[in-house]
């Protein structure tokens, strides 16, 4: 069985924004697709979709699924509308890739250690090894109107601190340049 986790790639990868499995052309090889509505879809909740015969068994054994409530109809309607828009948002997808490449290469040129060698996502992780430096940089960015998420142990390996820069297609070229200023 093959499961594809598209939490960070939905809306970003593939001709229709379905994710890495679509970009790699292996739709027929994937048995289960999981993802979240809280990132590119802009709502809450998540999903697991499948036509696999074992899908029902997963539904019966998956503790987070068993002990949760269904999403409200308004959230489902909003997520559905957002996904439909993502499927045809080719220009936005290209703009998002452009923004990610610009910020990634700019941060690398400034000497920051990043989580990947090239832009592979709309989330760019700046890796730091000093907690005080990470907190000070995070606070300075906030004070200057730039919001980034900071991740630290236990969410990261011991001694590793991340400033996670999340980009979107709506960032203008001027805003992208400000990120790098």
Where are each of the predicted segments found?
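Active-site PLP attachment segment
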Residues: 16, 22-57
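Amphipathic alpha-helix from the class-I
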Residues: 76-94, 105-110
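Conserved PLP phosphate-binding loop immediately N-terminal to the Schiff-base lysine helix
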Residues: 1-23
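Residue-level signature of catalytic and energy-coupling elements of molecular machines
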Residues: 5, 46, 79, 96, ...
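Short, ordered loop/turn segments at secondary-structure junctions
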Residues: 7-9, 52, 72, 153-155
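A short glycine-threonine-serine/GTX helix/turn-capping micro-motif
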Residues: 44-45, 62-71
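Conserved PLP-binding catalytic core of the aspartate aminotransferase-like
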Residues: 94-103, 108-145, 155-160, 167-169
